């Protein structure tokens, strides 16, 4: 089956469940295997939320998400923003448990670690919502108060109607290709240590950062020493970078 057919199957099953009187839907990406590939949770939630709204059934059911994709406040905000009622970040909890078993959290119990994680996520969500003048999660849920970058307008119209999409991008076929590639690398690799990735901090083989450590060091050195020649090295390094930002 194509990814679009699977998305339609999920929508149809959700409608049937609601019409049969179910009040809780649970979407989970657990149970992956070599033969079982995940679907992006954001697309699943958006598809079901939009479809149930069209059928005038959304108010009768809660959409509960159990996903390994939910790790930081951005992922929580987007999942809730497209319609998720609750989010269970099981992979984040598993990661906390692993680190707690290694005694990396000092005197804190595992329950304390989970509580502190939840508190930080809630604080991050409140900060995101407050920038829009929203203080209640129910007012933020399903509002799609963001815009997409790199998704085709067909996907945006089908799964996230009303979301601003100034720049188009890949469609379902492209997304599926990426998922298959990542899934293949994960299940065929013999490595037991995950690559760091460099999302939050610059890594040599990780994600590209405009403000790399070397350049930041040059900027700080130029300020502390009041050296224009060092600043020129910093400026040259910035100009030599390949285009990174869209603007």
What name fits each language-model region?
Residues 3-4, 27-32, 58:
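Gly-rich Lys/Arg/Thr-decorated short loops/hinges at beta-loop-alpha junctions or inter-strand turns
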Residues 27-43:
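Glycine-rich, proline-tolerant flexible connector loops at the mouths of alpha/beta enzymes
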Residues 11-25, 42-55, 125-128:
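Structured alpha-helical segments in the cores of large, soluble enzyme domains
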Residues 8-9, 141-247:
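Active-site loops and adjacent core secondary-structure elements that bind or stabilize anionic groups
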Residues 23-29, 89:
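Short beta-strand segments at enzyme active-site cores
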Residues 50-181:
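Phosphate/diphosphate-binding loops
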Residues 11-13, 32-36, 48, 64:
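Active-site-adjacent structural elements in folded domains
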Residues 1-10:
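Single conserved hydrophobic/aromatic residue that forms the stacking wall/gate
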